UniProtKB/Swiss-Prot annotation:
Name listed for the protein in its UniProt record: Na(+)/H(+) antiporter NhaA
Record's catalysed reaction(s): Na(+)(in) + 2 H(+)(out) = Na(+)(out) + 2 H(+)(in)
Places the protein is found: Cell membrane
The organism's taxonomic lineage, starting at the top: Bacteria, Pseudomonadati, Pseudomonadota, Gammaproteobacteria, Enterobacterales
Cross-referenced InterPro entries: Na/H_antiporter_dom_sf (IPR023171), NhaA (IPR004670)
Protein's job: Na(+)/H(+) antiporter that extrudes sodium in exchange for external protons.
Biological process according to GO: regulation of pH
Keyword Amino-acid biosynthesis set for record: no
Molecular function (Gene Ontology), one example: sodium:proton antiporter activity
Family in the record: Belongs to the NhaA Na(+)/H(+) (TC 2.A.33) antiporter family.
Membrane topology listed for this record: Multi-pass membrane protein
Length: 396
């Protein structure tokens, strides 16, 4: 019995398990969406729980998952990136620049390919930004299926690249797809950020103060019309790091926070996120081949993303603008570049904005195309890295 519990504990702690759990919930949602329970599933996830009258917004269960729970995931990412920037693989500026440059390439090429393929249909030209985003949660989930063979520096490179990608996507949403950005709330968000910077500068070590200001930051960003999960990344990066503090109490609090966030995200938030965002009913896709939209999205994500990410990474290193992460080769960068083609939720979010004034069928086609493209990208990226590390393991 004791051996059983030891094996069970090891299984749940294995990073592969969390990645498989994410994919399991994704396919569970797809399965339910194509059964007689489709209407029930759709009703539950979209049920308006709260109405925010001042901003004419309904808060459904899906909003709670995407706007509130996912903030905790982004908070963990922000803390991790801050750690790597101060004492880890991103401490070297030339290595920290690389994911930013790679992200730029990963946004330019997909958009160009999408525009080239869909140029004959002006009704879908507004969807160019669908292909620029990377879904951090799913990309990391797929990478973690490979388990302990993945170097930590490669995971950090993917996280950093995806963060730059998301920031780019959020800026695109703000400038191209937002009809009513609340400037007052943007100003309030800026003031909250400056306040957090100030208390960090004063070496305040009470973690609860940062959490309180983090809640204020989330609310102000949410009400501004910008995707609220960015508040998690901002808070994580702005929180003080134990490397320049002598407070053992703060260090213990941060260690507990990191451990709690890791468990919560891996085994609860990310699987729920997958379940709420993967429900696509295939019966809505008649005459799919008659539209240029699926081809623009597919080739933008599956080809444009890896070409842009890899090419800009390669040129950046060759022209000595940046350096590769420690222990990482261009072959591994190539594998990661395919995983960047997993657009999924952010791409779906942008498609809803891009085609909100067009018929609903276009949005269904876009969602289906994003799903297929993301699956293909994840399979290619996974197999590429799997066989690469298998080959390295055999050599050693």
């Amino acid at each position: 019995m004791k051996k059983f519990f030891i094996c069970k504990s090891k299984f749940f702690k294995n990073p592969t398990f969390s990645g498989l759990l994410l994919i399991l919930f994704c396919f569970l949602a797809i399965f339910i969406s194509n059964t007689n329970f489709w209407k029930t599933y759709n009703y539950i996830i979209n049920y308006p729980l709260i109405k925010i009258n001042t901003h004419d917004k309904n808060f459904s269960l899906t909003n709670i998952v995407n706007d509130i729970l996912m903030t905790f995931f982004f908070l963990e990412i922000g803390i991790e990136i801050k750690h790597e920037m101060l004492v880890g693989s991103l401490k070297n500026k030339s290595r920290a620049i690389l994911p930013g440059i790679a992200a730029i390439g990963g946004m330019i090429f997909p958009a160009l390919i999408y525009n080239f393929i869909t140029k004959e249909d002006s009704s879908i030209s507004s969807g160019w930004a669908i292909t620029v985003a990377t879904d951090i949660a799913f990309a990391v989930g797929v990478l973690k299926i490979l388990g302990h063979s993945i170097p930590h520096s490669l995971l950090i490179f993917l996280l950093s690249l995806a963060i730059f990608d998301d920031i780019g996507a959020i800026l695109i949403i703000a400038f191209f797809y937002s009809n009513h950005i609340d400037q007052y709330m943007i100003l309030l968000s800026t003031l909250v950020i400056l306040t957090i910077l100030s208390i960090n500068y004063l070496r305040v070590t009470c973690i609860y103060i940062y959490i309180i200001f983090g809640i204020l930051l989330w609310e102000s960003i949410f009400l501004s019309g910008i995707h609220s999960t960015i508040s998690g990344v901002i808070l994580g990066i702005l929180m003080p790091h134990s490397s320049y503090l002598s407070s053992s109490k703060y260090e213990k609090s941060m260690a507990f926070l990191k451990k709690s966030l890791s468990f919560l995200n891996k085994y609860f938030i990310l699987p729920i996120f997958a379940f709420f965002n993967s429900g696509i009913n295939f019966s809505n896709f008649e005459n799919l081949s008659s539209s240029l939209l699926p081809f623009g999205i597919f080739f933008g994500l599956v080809l444009g993303k890896p070409i842009g990410v890899f090419l800009f990474s390669y040129l950046s290193v060759k022209f000595k603008l940046s350096k590769l992460p420690v222990g990482i080769s261009f072959k591994e960068i190539a594998g990661i570049s395919f995983l960047c083609g997993i657009g999924f939720t952010m791409s779906i979010f942008i498609s809803n904005l891009a085609f909100q004034n067009i018929n609903e069928k276009i949005i269904y086609i876009a969602k289906f195309s994003i799903l297929i493209s993301s699956i293909v990208s994840s399979v290619i990226g996974f197999l590429f890295l799997y066989f690469l590390y298998k080959k390295i393991k055999l050599k050693n």
